[in-house]
């Protein structure tokens, strides 16, 4: 048995009908668009309140199970629903796509047809057609003479065919709503693309070191980490007279293939950007100290953060003075200004030492260090904390916001139309606008007045009908 093959158009025809008559009207429903918008706004608020892209330990500490925040919000619920990365969850992206589809459907079914209607026009050829306009009048013994020029002076585009005239201005206002929809679609597309292809990372790099981007805190499914490296040429901090940190700086180089391709000094609010990746100055730390004991070669000792009750920053390092590590010094550093506080293994304060200076321990603490022992503090090595971010959707978002402002401004232009018909007895004049009715009423009244004063009268052959100028019934007499 052979099954006859059907043409492709026979298969596609039901799909087209379903798309045009069922799916498209559903997506274009204003209630659906408002509901999606409110859902996106609510989830965005949740993503603003709940810290994003933090560690599990952070959520366990801030959202414990007992007692639960608001009686139900725990770290398990946050991680299960993906509220720790709201903007990258599949359901949030699905809402954005659905909202974008609703906007596109609205543009296709409502805004685009309205623009097509606005671009089409026709002359009014019968006097009674003017009576259906919001503003109209009859000027007996008047003609079209001078009217086209006056309309052009007011910014109208004028079309004339003998005794018939049509003029319009503000057509750009009809493009405004469409441009607003297009801009919103670009913003949504940029947000979706940024969630899928963007990433966030952190790096704590000591001064003088080179590091790659490895500590990723969040990345989309389509994200690609760059292969170039970051070199910290120098890191330093500016302090206020009272000891507060004013600003911290990092002299960075981008190494691509071992070659320096960009160098820039960054600080807070002054990042470095390279190939769509932005490096922000976010934090700082002390990585290590370089010291010498007596005449030994310089050696480097790492430092570790020391917790304090006040929550202030403090770092410590242990410097052994014996090969078996039974004796030594504890150095505490509160900042990068180069001052270290020295304590022995019993916790007794010995003295202080500044970067680039030496301290004879056998002189300041002869009981603890009877033999000659001089400590040289050559350098306190700082580390810069970088926040690294790549969001390829940002150009689309910026373009969308620019077009949005332009579209909103365009929407404020009134779309005004004027018709005129010259007969043997006189002139019929009418018009309408979609906004600024009072302004158009005044403009139309001035236009009628100027036409009455400038147009030469001719013998009337029929009585004037009732006319409406500015929305009021009157009898237009020359």
Swiss-Prot record:
Positions of the UniProt region annotated as Disordered: 453-478
Entries under InterPro entries matching the protein: Cyt_c_bgen_Ccs1/CcsB/ResB (IPR023494), ResB-like_domain (IPR007816)
Compositional bias segments (type: Pro residues): 456-466
Membrane topology: Multi-pass membrane protein
Function: Required during biogenesis of c-type cytochromes (cytochrome c6 and cytochrome f) at the step of heme attachment.
Family: Belongs to the Ccs1/CcsB family.
Protein name, entry field: Cytochrome c biogenesis protein CcsB
Keywords assigned by UniProt, alphabetized: Cytochrome c-type biogenesis, Membrane, Thylakoid, Transmembrane, Transmembrane helix
Signal peptide annotation: none
Pfam families (alphabetical): ResB
């Amino acid at each position: 048995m052979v099954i006859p093959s059907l043409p492709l158009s026979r298969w596609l025809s039901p799909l087209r009908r379903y798309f045009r008559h069922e799916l498209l009207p559903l997506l274009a429903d204003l209630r659906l668009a408002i509901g999606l918008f409110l859902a996106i706004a609510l989830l965005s608020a949740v993503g603003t309140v709940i810290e994003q892209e933090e560690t599990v330990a952070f959520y366990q500490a801030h959202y414990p199970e007992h007692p639960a925040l608001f009686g139900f919000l725990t770290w398990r619920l946050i991680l299960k629903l993906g509220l720790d990365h709201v903007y990258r969850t599949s359901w949030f992206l699905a809402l954005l796509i659905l909202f974008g589809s609703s906007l596109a459907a609205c543009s296709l079914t409502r805004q685009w047809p309205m623009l097509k209607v606005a671009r089409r026009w026709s002359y009014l050829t019968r006097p009674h057609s003017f009576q259906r306009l919001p503003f109209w009048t009859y000027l007996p013994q008047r003609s079209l003479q001078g009217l086209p020029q006056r309309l052009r002076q007011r910014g109208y585009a004028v079309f004339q065919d003998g005794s018939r005239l049509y003029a319009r201005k503000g057509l750009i206002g009809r493009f405004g709503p469409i441009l607003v929809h297009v801009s919103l679609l670009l913003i949504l597309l940029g947000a979706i693309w940024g969630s899928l292809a963007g990433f966030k990372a952190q790096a704590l790099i000591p001064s003088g070191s080179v590091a790659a981007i490895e500590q990723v805190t969040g990345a989309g499914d389509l994200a690609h980490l760059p292969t170039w490296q970051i070199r910290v040429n120098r890191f330093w901090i500016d302090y206020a007279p009272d000891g507060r940190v004013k600003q911290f700086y990092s002299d960075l180089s981008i190494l691509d293939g071992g070659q320096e391709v960009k160098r820039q000094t960054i600080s807070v609010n002054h990042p470095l950007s390279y190939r769509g990746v932005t490096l922000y100055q976010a934090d700082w730390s002390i990585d290590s100290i370089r010291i010498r004991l007596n005449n030994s070669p310089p050696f480097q000792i790492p430092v570790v953060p020391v917790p304090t009750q006040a929550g202030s920053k403090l770092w410590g390092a242990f410097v052994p003075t014996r090969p078996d590590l039974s004796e030594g010094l504890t150095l505490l550093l509160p900042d990068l200004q180069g001052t270290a506080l020295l304590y022995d293994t019993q916790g007794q304060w010995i003295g202080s030492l500044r970067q680039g200076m030496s301290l004879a321990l056998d002189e300041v603490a002869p009981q603890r260090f009877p033999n000659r022992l001089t400590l040289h503090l050559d350098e306190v090595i700082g580390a810069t904390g970088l926040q690294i971010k790549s969001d390829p959707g940002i150009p689309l978002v910026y373009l969308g916001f620019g077009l949005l402002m332009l579209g909103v401004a365009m929407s404020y232009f009134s779309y005004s139309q004027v018709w005129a018909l010259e007969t043997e007895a006189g002139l019929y004049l009418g018009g309408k606008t979609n906004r600024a009715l009072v302004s158009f009423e005044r403009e139309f009244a001035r236009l009628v007045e100027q036409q009455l004063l400038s147009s030469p009268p001719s013998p009337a052959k029929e009585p004037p009908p009732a006319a409406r100028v500015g929305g009021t019934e009157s009898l237009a007499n020359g």
